[in-house]
């Protein structure tokens, strides 16, 4: 009797359940699943959906599809299985940051995006079982809106001292040896570990490039123990249903909310120090010039995920709500794009412009 092969989704669910039920289990035999055509094809589809620019080889999705997706993926599969796969150099692109400085994105070629995506599809199933609920960035079924909603919830539950944390060049400071150790706690497949090492070391001796599919997962793995430390603090400092400290992270954007009650005086400073102590062994530094502590009871605002948040009284003055507005630079950018669209519209019908 022929055994029906399981789908990629079923495989990921099985891996997740195993990881969830056995928190110290180290997985092996994963490389076979990474190199399966179904995994590579799904990784290609995800890369195609994002429709990024070509990498250093100049090859676009249109070029690949003209020559044939299956031959393209077969070539990747054969390189991986033969042990001769080598990532190409990334194409560097600079984009402006909100503060006027430039951020360097490193764009892998599509071939390498597919390999990273296949690796992510399998490893994500393991580490999703380990990740803390207070982490929201680049995770399945999680979004910036959920992170913002939880920050608002913390403020409404009287955690009114806000630590707006800025990490200094987080992705550039991730230490490869520490990241590999963290992954190896769950993975004992030498071929997978070799592939991870190839990907993260392709751009230098320290840091991981922003722009590849694997980087967000690696960044979450790196800070997961910090996330759980603050979840423990949240539980230990809670009094019944009332929490005194809450922590929210989206990639490298962190907010810590602390009770403004007089009995909790000094707790915010202790929370910030604890964060510094947790980050120091990882080589991650706080940007002390930009990390700020604000009191929303005094009408002070703070930024999170492109929004300015402020606590203001409601119309009847018998309560309050958290007001969110896109940051000024974001509003200016959107207005400029709308203006450009209108100016370039010419005599187009309104429905086409919309």
Task: Please name every model-derived segment.
Residues 110-118, 346:
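Duplex nucleic acid-engaging cores and interfaces of nucleic-acid transaction enzymes
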Residues 35-45, 198-206, 292, 349-353:
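Short, hydrophobic/aliphatic alpha-helical segments
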Residues 1-70:
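Non-catalytic, polymerase-adjacent accessory regions of viral genome-replication enzymes
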Residues 72-75, 79-94, 98, 130-296, ...:
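Conserved polymerase palm-domain catalytic core
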Residues 104-105, 109, 320:
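Conserved phosphate-binding loops in nucleotide/dinucleotide-binding enzymes
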């Amino acid at each position: 009797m022929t055994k029906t092969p399981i789908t990629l989704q079923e495989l990921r669910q099985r891996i997740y359940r195993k990881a969830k039920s056995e928190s110290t289990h180290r997985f092996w035999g994963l490389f076979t699943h990474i190199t399966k055509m179904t995994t590579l094809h799904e990784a290609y589809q995800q890369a195609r959906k994002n429709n990024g620019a070509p990498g250093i080889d100049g090859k676009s999705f249109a070029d690949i599809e003209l020559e044939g997706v299956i031959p393209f993926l077969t070539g990747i599969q054969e390189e991986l299985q033969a042990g001769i796969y080598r990532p190409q150099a990334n194409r560097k692109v600079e984009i402006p940051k909100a503060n006027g400085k430039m951020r360097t994105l490193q764009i892998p070629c599509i071939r390498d995006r597919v390999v990273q995506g296949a690796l992510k599809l399998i490893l994500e199933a393991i580490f999703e079982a380990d990740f803390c609920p207070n982490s929201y960035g680049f995770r399945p079924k999680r979004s910036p809106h959920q992170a913002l909603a939880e920050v608002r919830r913390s403020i409404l539950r009287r955690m009114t001292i806000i630590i707006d944390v800025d990490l200094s060049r987080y992705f550039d400071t991730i230490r490869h040896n520490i990241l590999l150790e963290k992954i190896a706690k769950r993975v004992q497949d030498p071929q997978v570990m070799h592939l991870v090492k190839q990907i993260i070391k392709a751009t230098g001796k320290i840091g991981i490039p922003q722009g590849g599919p694997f980087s967000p997962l690696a960044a979450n793995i790196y800070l997961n123990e910090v996330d759980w430390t603050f979840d423990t603090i949240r539980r230990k400092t809670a009094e019944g249903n009332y929490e005194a400290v809450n922590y929210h992270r989206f990639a490298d954007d962190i907010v810590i909310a602390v009770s403004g009650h007089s009995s909790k005086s000094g707790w915010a400073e202790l929370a910030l120090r604890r964060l510094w102590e947790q980050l120091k062994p990882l080589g991650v530094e706080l940007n002390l010039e930009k990390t700020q502590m604000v009191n929303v009871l005094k009408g002070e605002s703070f930024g999170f995920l492109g929004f300015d948040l402020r606590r203001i009284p409601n119309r009847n003055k018998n309560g309050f709500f958290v007001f969110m507005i896109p940051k000024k630079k974001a509003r200016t950018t959107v207005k400029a794009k709308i203006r450009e669209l209108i100016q370039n519209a010419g005599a187009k019908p309104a429905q086409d412009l919309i």
